[in-house]
Every structure is written in C-alpha cells, then in structure tokens.
Regions:
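Conserved beta-strand hairpin/beta-sheet module of binuclear metal-dependent hydrolase folds
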Residues: 2-51, 137-150
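Hydrophobic/aromatic beta-strand patches that form the interior of the parallel beta-sheet core
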Residues: 9-11, 63, 88, 125, ...
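Short catalytic-loop micro-motif centered on adjacent basic/acidic residues
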Residues: 33-36, 61-65, 124
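Short, glycine/acidic-enriched loop or turn micro-motifs at the edges of active sites
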Residues: 39-40, 69, 154, 208
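Active-site metal-binding motif and surrounding structural segment of the metallo-beta-lactamase
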Residues: 42-88
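Short, basic, glycine/proline-bearing loop/turn elements
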Residues: 60-62, 119-122, 170-177
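Metallo-beta-lactamase
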Residues: 88-211
Length: 212
C-alpha cells in the first residue's frame, strides 16, 4: 500500500515474468471510493488494509472500468464486507455482472454523466474497452483533478508506488490504434480527453503520471 497522491492510496502487485504491475486505488473522502477490486485473490489481500484505512467508515462506491478479472474479480469479497456498496460501471458491465452471480447494487454510467457525493465529483468518459469494442469507462474526479485511466495509458515495469512526469496532451497522442483499434472511436475519445485537465493520471497498470 502506498499513499500515491494526496488522499489517494494505491494497492499493487508486480508480476516479474511479464514486467506488469496491477493497481487498485482508494480515494479517501467523506464517501470513500475504491477504483478496481483486483482479482478475488487480490481483493482478499487488500481488504484488511482498506478496512484499516477506513477506520469504521463504510465503502460507498466501487468504480469498475470494464469487465475483466483484475478490474472486478473481487466484487463479491467487497460486497460481503460492505453489503450496501454501489458498483459504478458501464452499461454493458451493468448487464453482465448479474450473469456472473453478482447481486449487489449497480449504477450504470455513460459519456459525460456526473456523480456528485460527499467530497468528490466524478465525470465519466466512454472508451471502447469492453468485449466487441463496446464502451467501458474512464473516470475523472474533478475536485482532486485525478484521471483514472483504466487500461488506456499503461506501461510495463515494476511501478509499485512509483510516478513519472509527462504532458497530458502527449499521453493522449500516444493512445494509438493498437490500444483502440477503431480510428473513428479513437478520434472521438481523444477529443473528449482534451477537454480535461488532470494533475495526476492514476493508471490501471504501470507508472502513475504527474501531468506537467
């Protein structure tokens, strides 16, 4: 566990053979927010640390970028500990989760939707990260100016607790057709991202980025 930026805690695992780092985040505010659960094994590992940080507070929201085991594989573990937690996800993910046995509260969001709570204001950005290039979500917390990028802006290497510096526009320009294999959707996404002005990119994998 690392305090990566202001009230943002990072929980990570590095997989040496792949030189790949997987992160989850806890944004500490009046309504605490978890970004990604990790796999079931990761969730069971980080849950005691999260409970310690919350000091009796209830976990209010879990943000899920897209349907993948490292994003939402541990949902049931968190729902068991926090039965009223609300999973915030894409419309596709909201339809799929019950089919995998998840019966918790779900809130579906899409491009330009907002979610305001105690201590946070979230804006949602569509990006084609779900099966068959359907839209998943990235998240922008407007008060802290943190952009949660999901799998959009990833790098390889041991990035546990580490940050790097870069320019926001350069990070957007680096999103290519290998990442988003549809030119039209890529252009729409890049135009949408240029409307934001984050101070930090909290990546799903790799080094968090402090924006110059």
């Amino acid at each position: 566990m690392n305090l990566i930026y202001n009230d943002l805690y990072q929980f990570s695992i590095h997989i040496p053979p792949m030189q790949f780092t997987i992160h989850q985040y806890l944004l500490m505010c009046a309504d605490p927010i978890l970004v990604s659960t990790g796999t079931m094994q990761q969730a069971e590992h980080i849950l005691p640390e999260i409970k310690k940080l919350l000091k009796g507070q209830t976990l209010k929201y879990i943000l899920v970028s897209h349907m993948e085991s490292d994003e939402c594989g541990g949902l049931i573990a968190f729902q068991k500990e926090y039965p009223d937690v609300i999973t915030v996800c894409s419309q596709l993910c909201a339809r799929e989760l019950p089919g995998f046995g998840y019966n918790g509260k779900i809130l579906a969001k899409k491009q330009d939707d907002l979610l305001d709570g105690n201590g946070f204001s979230l804006k949602f950005i569509d990006y084609p990260s779900e099966v068959h290039l359907q839209n998943g979500l990235a998240f922008y917390e407007e008060n802290s100016k943190i952009f949660f990028s999901g799998d959009l802006m990833l790098r390889f290497g041991d990035a546990v607790g580490k940050t790097m510096d870069s320019f926001w526009k350069e990070e957007i320009a680096a999103i290519d057709l290998e990442r988003i294999p549809n030119a039209e959707k890529l252009e729409v996404l890049q135009k949408s991202l240029l409307q934001l002005n984050p101070d930090l990119i909290a990546v799903g994998h790799g080094f968090c980025i402090k924006c110059k």
